């Protein structure tokens, strides 16, 4: 959930959605651009359980994460592949990592596949090719309607084989407008186009929300036809591929699980969509990604 400055943005966004308590908060991993908003959400809302990867790191934001969990006596779980959690009429299953490696960071990302009725969502944090291959080898179900592109559309994620297994109808890329990492990369954008999925980009379109009623999906914005990579967007290159979106702030690793009587809402990165649940999971997550504040590659 964004850099420190964006923690209040994540909290404000969730409050605007009517969130009062969180059944689950998922910290995909401990990079600052995924964890700061999580810490803010834990301070602001009552939380039933936190799901996080089983490793430690020597950073101030991780220390803050540990502190708020202890101070508020929040249940903390290190989920395993196959663990399933219920959210009203929806549920989500952990799809990665197969093994927690203390030497890894991005490939320790906790990934979930969320299902509500006939709709499904795949969110895997900053998982790279090694973790993607482990998912493919394990045989977990990956096929999903909506795929939140791992690692902000980095070339080291969303391999061709993985994209074939997911077979998404829509791909959301959460990346900061004008970020210095070139996210999303040309390679990943080409893979999205090749699989025929609709493309949504927070660097061009700001906050993106997808809502499921268990049968169909509703989007807050139209899909973009702009396939410029992150470097081209940062350089101000003209869009020759289609229609550009509108740059703005977005919310994308923080929280899952407040009452939503209208259906399932999902916000691209947190974070992190569920029946009777508002999901901000790596989907309330990185406000920094969506407003040009990426700090981790």
Model-predicted regions and their roles:
Residues 1-297:
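Non-globular, low-confidence helical/coil segments that flank catalytic cores
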């Amino acid at each position: 959930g964004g850099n420190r400055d964006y923690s209040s943005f994540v909290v404000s966004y969730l409050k605007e959605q009517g969130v009062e308590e969180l059944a689950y908060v998922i910290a995909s991993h401990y990079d600052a651009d995924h964890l700061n908003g999580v810490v803010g959400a834990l301070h602001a809302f009552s939380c039933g359980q936190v799901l996080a990867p089983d490793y430690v790191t020597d950073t101030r934001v991780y220390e803050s994460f540990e502190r708020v969990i202890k101070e508020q006596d929040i249940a903390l779980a290190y989920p395993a592949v196959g663990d399933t959690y219920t959210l009203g009429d929806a549920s989500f299953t952990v799809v990665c990592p197969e093994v927690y490696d203390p030497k890894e960071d991005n490939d320790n990302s906790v990934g979930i596949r969320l299902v509500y009725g006939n709709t499904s969502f795949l969110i895997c944090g900053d998982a790279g090719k090694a973790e993607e291959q482990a998912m493919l080898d394990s045989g977990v179900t990956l096929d999903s309607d909506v795929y939140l592109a791992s690692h902000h559309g980095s070339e080291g994620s969303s391999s061709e084989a993985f994209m074939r297994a997911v077979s998404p109808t829509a791909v959301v890329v959460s990346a900061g407008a004008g970020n210095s990492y070139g996210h999303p990369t040309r390679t990943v954008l080409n893979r999205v186009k090749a699989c025929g999925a609709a493309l949504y980009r927070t660097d061009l379109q700001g906050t993106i929300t997808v809502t499921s009623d268990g049968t169909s999906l509703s989007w807050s914005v139209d899909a973009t036809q702009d396939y410029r990579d992150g470097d081209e967007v940062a350089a101000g290159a003209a869009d020759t591929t289609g229609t550009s979106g509108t740059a703005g702030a977005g919310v994308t690793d923080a929280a899952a699980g407040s009452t939503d009587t209208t259906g399932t809402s999902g916000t691209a990165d947190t974070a992190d969509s569920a029946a009777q649940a508002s999901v901000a999971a790596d989907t309330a997550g990185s406000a920094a990604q969506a407003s040009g504040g990426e700090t981790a590659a």
